[in-house]
Amino acid sequence: MAARLLLRSLRVLKARSAPRPPPSARCSHSGAEARLETPSAKKLTDVGIRRIFSSEHDIFRESVRKFFQEEVIPHHTEWEKAGEVSREVWEKAGKQGLLGINIAEKHGGIGGDLLSTAVTWEEQAYSNCTGPGFSLHSDIVMPYIANYGTKEQIEKFIPQMTAGKCIGAIAMTEPGAGSDLQGVRTNAKRSGSDWILNGSKVFITNGWLSDLVIVVAVTNREARSPAHGISLFLVENGMKGFIKGRKLHKMGMKAQDTAELFFEDVRLPANALLGEENKGFYYLMQELPQERLLIAELAISACEFMFEETRNYVKQRKAFGKTVAHIQTVQHKLAELKTHICVTRAFVDSCLQLHETKRLDSGSASMAKYWASELQNSVAYECVQLHGGWGYMWEYPIAKAYVDARVQPIYGGTNEIMKELIARQIVSDS
């Protein structure tokens, strides 16, 4: 890991040397009182010490955890009502070095390793705050620019994105094209040296707050297949004809801004093209495994959070003259949950290590995303059940975790598509 990342973490820890808040403060956004604090992230569900992280990662984790405790959790309820987080928290995240961690320093990023990035994914999940779209911005959008952008594009956008002053989004999904990227209808046509962009996108995370959107568009309808006629464009907020529609009111992830985007004869200069013309589908296929690994990591970390919340609850809740935790059926359910979570954590950690060394393939990433997101929904269901009626109350974190989980098997490619990709690799002759 880069020395810059470690030094920044040490500075933040020194500056924030105040005592750790009492247990209830960790979940103060929920309204529930006297809830035990989630244990150290290294020992969630008693799996023992995870061996993929170094002492530097542990130091960094402490600073990330403090950030979410102090800058995110206290404001999350307010953000849920607004349907968006504040721009201020983006800039604070930038100052703390939480954005663009895995982007090389030469490109304006932090220069940390993938596991440092994973620390931020985990800690956000452990905070039970899904509002800030930091991971999409840093680990889905920024890699496209860093990997396929020109020197000018990198220098213009990456430093501002790392600072949290330019919020990024990526616009793939359309009203009639979700997991089927080859069904995209948004198009860009040449006009001299410029491009004219028309179409619409939907369900775009960070869409409302975005300053920069990577737009997937058809540039060659005569290509031998739709995959050979797609390009990526950098569209900046304020461009004439670029219209942000309404913020969408979702079932879960209520603090995360999600929007419709419309493009009506948006004139784009030649340098708005990201990468090569008609290579967009190839770029998407190269980057989607990381997106799916991200979803898997968020999913298993959410499972760990929900398990700890539930274990703490049943150890305190009394029924039939004893704590619920001492009822055999509850113990068996906890045993099942813990086993499933620990086994899945081992697989996701293995995928993280593979991806750190550039060896994670599409099939493995798809398996991780499919399995972990399905488990997340299963764990959410069982944990709400173990909370009884209180689990249905919004003031309890488990209720929010339940509705936030539902989208995980849908975005990033539905789990039905994940099975197709896994099966394709299994039966392939190569």
Swiss-Prot record:
Q: SUPFAM superfamilies given for it?
A: Acyl-CoA dehydrogenase C-terminal domain-like (SSF47203), Acyl-CoA dehydrogenase NM domain-like (SSF56645)
Residues where N6-acetyllysine occurs? 42, 66, 81, 92, 95, 254, 279, 318, 322, 358
Q: Knockout consequence? A: Acadl deficiency results in significant gestational loss of embryos. Homozygous knockout mice that achieve birth display severe fasting intolerance with subsequent hepatic and cardiac lipidosis, hypoglycemia, elevated serum free fatty acids, non-ketotic dicarboxylic aciduria, and myocardial degeneration.
* Gene Ontology terms for molecular function: flavin adenine dinucleotide binding; long-chain fatty acyl-CoA dehydrogenase activity
| Modification note | Acetylation at Lys-318 and Lys-322 in proximity of the cofactor-binding sites strongly reduces catalytic activity. These sites are deacetylated by SIRT3.
Q: Where in the cell is it found?
A: Mitochondrion matrix
The family line of this record is:
Belongs to the acyl-CoA dehydrogenase family.
Q: What does this protein do?
A: Long-chain specific acyl-CoA dehydrogenase is one of the acyl-CoA dehydrogenases that catalyze the first step of mitochondrial fatty acid beta-oxidation, an aerobic process breaking down fatty acids into acetyl-CoA and allowing the production of energy from fats.
Protein name as it appears in the record: Long-chain specific acyl-CoA dehydrogenase, mitochondrial
Organism lineage string: Eukaryota, Metazoa, Chordata, Craniata, Vertebrata
